[in-house]
Amino acid sequence: MKILVCLKQVPHKDARLELTSDGSWIQDANIKFEINDYDNYALEEALRIKDKDAASEVVVLSIGPDRVQQSLRTALGMGADRAIQIWDDGLAHADSLAIAKSIAAVARAEKCDLVLLGLMADDTNFALTGPMLAELLDVPHATGITSAKFEGGQVEVERELEGGALEVVKLPLPCLLTVQTGMNEVRYASLKGIMQAKKKPLDKKSLADVGLSAGAVAAKVKIEKIFSPPKGGGAEILSGSKDEVANKFVGKVKELGLL
């Protein structure tokens, strides 16, 4: 089985974030980055499949400037076989559809049996790339999975729904799955794995290399502004005995016209 795992590099959880001058995104020049948490679980699931079937190949892919190579090397150190980086100036302001189109071009060329992604990205929480990618590849998909069992050319997955409910879905291969956090226990790269990762192939591709133009991945969605929610007026503490506090509370409610 050939498995493509899509990894997004996001700002480190401890990074001190500042907005750009136009307020459209964060300044990313001098902050630390890490693999998106959801994607770590997707990678771990792929590696567990490979643990059971040594003939399986795990290919990791990330879209971004050269800093993403660090995350790709980490994935190789954990056990992935190959890495692919896609970057082009035309992707500098890419939206979810542009990212999905870029991944789809690679997935078609690789002829993958399974595509795995995290449910969403820690920095945007859109959860759009997976379903868009499945549509572009014309393959069945399931989102937010918490378990997967592969047998006889198909996979049975459990999906996490609202309210704690679980849904069981069967899909034929090839297919695409987006993974929920907590699906498994993510491994660390061993020292041996880190050393081996230096010798594993990491292929950097441009849009032209994957058969796309800048126009084909032009963003349809633009983030206009990011801002912190306005601060509230604070809270008023009512003091006194129980009866006094109750009377004051009723008075305040009447004063606000709520009673």
Question: Positions of the model-derived regions?
Answer:
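N-terminal glycine-rich FAD/FM-binding segment characteristic of electron-transfer flavoproteins
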Residues: 1-259
